[in-house]
Amino acid sequence: MPDYVNWLRHASPYINAHRDCTFVVMLPGDGVEHPNFGNIVHDLVLLHSLGVRLVLVHGSRPQIESRLADRGLTPHYHRGMRITDAATLDCVIDAVGALRLAIEARLSMDIAASPMQGSRLRVASGNLVTARPIGVLEGVDYHHTGEVRRVDRKGISRLLDERSIVLLSPLGYSPTGEIFNLACEDVATRAAIELGADKLLLFGAEPGLLDADGRLVRELRPQQVAPHLQRLGSDYQGELLDAAAEACKGGVARSHIVSYAEDGALLTELFTRGGGGTLVSQEQFEVVREATIEDVGGLLELISPLEEQGILVRRSREVLEREIEQFSVVEREGMIIACAALYPIADSEAGELACLAVNPEYRHGGRGDELLERIESRARQMGLSTLFVLTTRTAHWFRERGFAPSGVERLPAARASLYNYQRNSKIFEKPL
């Protein structure tokens, strides 16, 4: 079977879930200059064709720097923000205007060169962001550098209803006709909050948020952001993370940080369960709970490969339906990714831990330990004093968690009589 068939099958729930949702996408000026920009535009057009309501916010920092250099002007910053005097503002207007036209042209060209040729795509922009001056901070006058005062929610919503892609530039206008240079991260965050967007997608140079060891942080909540911001300091990753957290605090369900340098990063993040970047959300990513009859299909999908390998004892659908109350599961976005069962042993104060399984894609997140802890807690609540486990392949894992080698003679009679000598499982026990 071709890989794309399997991918499409797995992506179909997300295609349905994203339809008619509002996504605000922020692409910095570095991303527009990157060779992968064309692929990003193609992916945005694809999202639009799938029914996603798109607001694209672009940055322009390197383009402004280039204009300043061409005119022999020196850029000035304070606290990481550009000081926009009159001469700099001319460069900002020039750079932003040219960039906006280039993006509109690229969006138009992309659909003409794609399989969706002939379909109508409108890009809309305008005076949709009202701004105010930052003013004087710590004795420094920021001149024409501003901050977002208001986003025209009704105007943008109307354009989205008309199936336009809304393009917002890092410029804002005051009621008195002044123009202000804005941070694209601020524009994107405020737009996402005021529009009640379903997602804020932030492009950066890295795959997402990287920890101190350079490893990708896949998920975190806004409350977990502060230590990372302190570590990152003025690094651009910190700006993206701060924007992502701010959007979530403002009511945006999910913020994502992905790489503009990686082809397909946006689609991977949106249409695969594991994603490819960093997700910031107030939502609970996973839940550990008792299984219900509706979980039988998911359990079969999880344990069948392990049964075929001889790691787990085979259980039919009928057996699972009959014994479903014995199971605890870890659910992630509607998918059962881990399970374990507790079987009290008749005429004894012992129980058996069975069918502990974790989806291969999620085996390094401590989910096995979480389920073991839950099973042990359930066993104590039931008044059991000993927990047995029979295994053929994971003896060391259980020994590392306090289980000691045992034997058939130690099993309660009701369980010993069912022992499969042909399978020859190793027996371990743990006092509770």
UniProtKB/Swiss-Prot annotation:
Transmembrane segments: none annotated. GO terms for molecular function: L-glutamate N-acetyltransferase activity. This is Amino-acid acetyltransferase. Keywords: Acyltransferase, Amino-acid biosynthesis, Arginine biosynthesis, Cytoplasm, Transferase. The lineage of its organism: Bacteria, Pseudomonadati, Pseudomonadota, Gammaproteobacteria, Pseudomonadales. GO terms for biological process: L-arginine biosynthetic process. Its EC number is 2.3.1.1. Belongs to the acetyltransferase family. ArgA subfamily. Pathway: Amino-acid biosynthesis; L-arginine biosynthesis; N(2)-acetyl-L-ornithine from L-glutamate: step 1/4. The gene is argA. Gene3D superfamilies: 3.40.630.30, Acetylglutamate kinase-like. It is an enzyme of class 2 (transferase). Residues 286-432 form the N-acetyltransferase domain. It catalyses: L-glutamate + acetyl-CoA = N-acetyl-L-glutamate + CoA + H(+). It is found in: Cytoplasm. One of its GO terms (cellular component) is cytoplasm.
